[in-house]
């Protein structure tokens, strides 16, 4: 079981994959004041459903004009998980998995266009058959859920099919 997590600055998503099939998906787009609490709640819900899962998440990075502290919500969201299961959590630099999937690595400019191109890669993988929840998330262009799925998929394909 893999959980992919895309925290985002103002919104985010998480998706649980079992053998490539989406079994749960969460997305959140809270107000600025509630952003971190919503992320923590969403992450806690996902982890409580799948305590044996391996977590793959985008590593916080500093963007021009923004402090790394801006990404404090990510660490609050998954800090307890990381402390409890440090060997079952993997931080991935956004540019690494995006470039390996052929996506544009710029965070904002062509992000949605790149995600739209890569969403078909998730669905066309002959080794998986994502359920309707996943397909709906992609068709509605919920980029946070799609990114969460992509980072989990990247890990599964490049690191040994999501071994526990």
Q: At which residue positions do the language-model features occur?
A:
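Phosphate- and other anionic-substrate recognition elements at nucleic-acid/protein interfaces
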Residues: 1-164
């Amino acid at each position: 079981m893999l959980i992919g997590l895309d925290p985002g600055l103002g919104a985010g998503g998480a998706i649980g994959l079992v053998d490539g099939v989406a079994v749960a998906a969460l997305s959140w787009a809270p107000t600025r004041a509630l952003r971190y609490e919503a992320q923590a709640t969403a992450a806690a819900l996902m982890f409580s459903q799948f305590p044996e899962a391996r977590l793959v998440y985008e590593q916080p990075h500093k963007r021009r004009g923004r402090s790394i502290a801006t990404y404090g919500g990510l660490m609050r969201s998954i800090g307890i998980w990381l402390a409890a299961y440090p060997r079952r959590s993997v931080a991935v630099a956004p540019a690494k998995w995006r470039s390996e999937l052929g996506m544009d690595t710029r965070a904002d400019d062509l992000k949605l266009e790149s995600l739209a191109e890569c969403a078909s890669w998730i669905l066309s993988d002959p080794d998986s058959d994502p359920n309707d929840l996943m397909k709906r998330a992609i068709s509605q262009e919920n980029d946070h859920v799609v990114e969460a799925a992509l980072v989990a998929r990247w890990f599964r394909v490049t690191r040994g099919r999501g071994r526990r």
